[in-house]
Amino acid sequence: MAEDATSSHPSRYVKLTKDQDAPAEDIRPGELNQPVHVPQLEGRRCSECGQVLPESYEPPADEPWTTGIFGCTDDPETCRTGLFCPCVLFGRNVEAVREDIPWTTPCVCHAVFVEGGITLAILTAIFHGVDPRTSFLIGEGLVFSWWLCATYTGIFRQGLQRKYHLKNSPCDPCMVHCCLHWCANCQEHRERTGRLAENNAVPMTVVNPPPVQEMSMLEEVEEKGAEKSEHDDVEVIPL
């Protein structure tokens, strides 16, 4: 029975002889597991999420900042925090850009390198006097620590600009923090809080209730009279 089925339906597989079969040692490991070439997945990718972008995609143009670099008086609370506790304000800005970093970490780094460096320079000048050699060492230390601070804080300003597609205002982020660190810190906080307020604003839909309907006595009498007349028109036909 099986032989009849085999003869009626021949096998679709080709049997190789020993000469035609390739030896196992000629097959290199991983040769059969090569990646598949998919042209659709080789286009431009988003720098934030890594998703493949369509060919017709054009990145949005950079927008200007909503407040200027010297607009500290627009938000007095932010201005006071940035003046007396700039490390706290900087930590909150970093946490908004990088959610995986708690605000306490950049706050401590800012307090050590910026506030700590300034305090150390003042104490050195008080206890050791201000001679030419000491002044040179103090100035060199302040310039080096300030340069590190401007580079570190400028990186997060760049991240904020990429997140909200903002222009360089008034110049490169690192240079802004190097020259106007306190003003830049307050500007970033104002921009961040303003963007969050715009995103959280939900449009409200006003629904007006239907008008109150009242029935007067005259309409009620007319309605009862109409119902009675309908019943009076009924005719009884004997069978």
UniProtKB/Swiss-Prot annotation:
InterPro entries: PLAC_motif_containing. Expressed in roots, leaves, stalks, apical meristems, immature ears, endosperm, pericarp and tassel spikelets. Pfam families: PLAC8. It comes from the Eukaryota. Residues 1-33 are annotated as: Disordered. It is found in: Membrane. Residues 16-29 have a biased composition (Basic and acidic residues). The keyword Transmembrane helix applies. Keywords: Membrane, Transmembrane, Transmembrane helix. The chain crosses the membrane at residues 107-127, 136-156. It is a multi-pass membrane protein. One of its GO terms (cellular component) is membrane. Its main location: membrane. Residues 1-10 have a biased composition (Polar residues). Belongs to the cornifelin family. This is Cell number regulator 6. It comes from Zea mays (Maize). The gene is CNR6.
